[in-house]
């Protein structure tokens, strides 16, 4: 690859950890890192307008290749002028490869060297996704950052299976690079796999780094392993990745996991967590999680989070938001979703300042002491 639509600029490494302060330059703008990326599965972040996402400070959003391929179709989106125009978002977009959804949503999967045959989860029809097809779909979507097609083995699968899987993923990555028809305006990332096996992560990283991708994703985590196991994998994986390229931890959105990922040198994160739990009335606050539907909030006229300056907390009370959710009013979900997204995007803003000030470990301790991390919050 001779041209570089995606560029990473390292501004500072924190003195006491591997945390990196930087920025990523894309064809649709520059965003600071570390950054949490809201997920817009169906070309929309659920209940949020583009204007609201900009007010939150979302410098980049993620959309899902698998879902947009099935509905409304990548060719239709291309005819509309590309995903940015289709959804009226003029800032950077990252698309995944569709691989994770194939393995997690689709039925009757059959994995071969050529690709994956599976049943469409919407109508049961037979579908086939190959490395070349995954790249073609993303080329049609026109995202700024694309992902190679990979297999995401379960964390506790046997060693021999995972070894064969990562070797196939490396061959798929090479095929995807060759199929990429828009290298001048779309950056392609490779995805490091290997479950919890250090030697396989090392092999996967070496294969992909040799292909000179514009960035590297760490896949196969946040799939049921413990927080400690995730950190252990990051401890031996991120040092294998080039310092001059972005590092992206896929599918992670719990506050402690974000901070611990940053400490280990990760630059980008995404997760559906903030909007998913918001729809059930669970809110992230500086004092821990808050389940707003609880009866004790029926006459609580204070904000969701006393330390939050988001639109929701500046204008609406716990009692009002609880009323909306109990009445099944969509506006309640909009308010809780806005708040949760703001909470994580703003957390990353505070993390960036802590890196600048060389006090990230102190920030982590103070944050988690207030947040009250325990087993009940661990998956939150």
From Swiss-Prot:
Cofactor: Zn(2+)
Gene Ontology biological process: queuosine biosynthetic process; tRNA wobble guanine modification; tRNA-guanine transglycosylation
Segments for region (RNA binding): 251-257, 275-279
Binding residues for Zn(2+): 308, 310, 313, 339
EC number(s) on file: 2.4.2.29
Alphabetical UniProt keywords: Glycosyltransferase, Metal-binding, Queuosine biosynthesis, Transferase, tRNA processing, Zinc
Function statement: Catalyzes the base-exchange of a guanine (G) residue with the queuine precursor 7-aminomethyl-7-deazaguanine (PreQ1) at position 34 (anticodon wobble position) in tRNAs with GU(N) anticodons (tRNA-Asp, -Asn, -His and -Tyr). Catalysis occurs through a double-displacement mechanism. The nucleophile active site attacks the C1' of nucleotide 34 to detach the guanine base from the RNA, forming a covalent enzyme-RNA intermediate. The proton acceptor active site deprotonates the incoming PreQ1, allowing a nucleophilic attack on the C1' of the ribose to form the product.
Residues of the active site: 96, 270
Gene3D superfamilies: Queuine tRNA-ribosyltransferase-like
Name of the top EC class for this enzyme: transferase
Organism superkingdom: Bacteria
Subunit structure: Homodimer. Within each dimer, one monomer is responsible for RNA recognition and catalysis, while the other monomer binds to the replacement base PreQ1.
GO cellular component, one term: cytosol
Protein name per its UniProtKB record: Queuine tRNA-ribosyltransferase
Species name: Streptococcus pyogenes serotype M6 (strain ATCC BAA-946 / MGAS10394)
């Amino acid at each position: 690859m001779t041209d570089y639509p995606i560029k990473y600029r390292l501004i500072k490494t924190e003195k006491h950890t591997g945390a990196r302060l930087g920025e990523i330059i894309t064809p649709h703008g520059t965003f600071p890192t570390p950054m949490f990326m809201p997920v817009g599965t169906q070309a929309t972040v659920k209940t949020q307008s583009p204007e609201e996402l900009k007010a939150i400070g979302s410098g980049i959003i993620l959309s899902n290749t698998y879902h947009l391929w099935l509905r409304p179709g990548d060719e239709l989106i291309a005819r509309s002028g590309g995903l940015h125009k289709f959804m009226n978002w003029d800032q950077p977009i990252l698309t995944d490869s569709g691989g994770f959804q194939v393995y997690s949503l689709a039925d009757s999967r059959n994995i071969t060297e050529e690709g994956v045959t599976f049943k469409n989860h919407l109508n049961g029809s037979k579908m086939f996704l190959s490395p070349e097809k995954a790249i073609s779909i993303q080329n049609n979507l026109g995202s700024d950052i694309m992902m190679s097609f990979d297999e995401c083995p379960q964390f506790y699968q046997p060693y021999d299976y995972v070894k064969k899987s990562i070797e196939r993923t490396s061959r798929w990555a090479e095929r995807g690079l060759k199929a990429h028809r828009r290298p001048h305006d779309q950056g392609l990332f490779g995805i490091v796999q290997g479950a919890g096996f250090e030697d396989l992560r090392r092999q996967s990283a070496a294969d992909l780094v040799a292909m000179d991708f514009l960035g590297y994703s760490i896949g196969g985590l946040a799939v049921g392993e413990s927080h400690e196991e995730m950190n252990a994998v990051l401890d031996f994986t991120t040092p294998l990745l080039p310092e001059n390229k972005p590092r992206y931890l896929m599918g992670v959105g719990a506050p402690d996991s974000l901070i611990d990922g940053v400490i280990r040198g990760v630059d980008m994160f995404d997760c559906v967590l903030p909007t998913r739990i918001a729809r059930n009335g669970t809110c992230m606050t500086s004092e821990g999680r808050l389940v707003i539907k609880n009866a004790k909030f029926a006459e609580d006229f204070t904000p969701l989070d006393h330390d939050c300056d988001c639109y929701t907390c500046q204008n609406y009370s716990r009692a009002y938001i609880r009323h909306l959710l109990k009445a099944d009013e969509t506006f309640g979900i909009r308010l809780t979703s806005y708040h949760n997204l703001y909470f994580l995007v703003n957390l990353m803003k505070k993390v960036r300042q802590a890196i600048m000030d060389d006090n990230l470990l102190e920030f982590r301790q103070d944050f988690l002491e207030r947040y009250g991390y325990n087993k009940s919050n661990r998956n939150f």
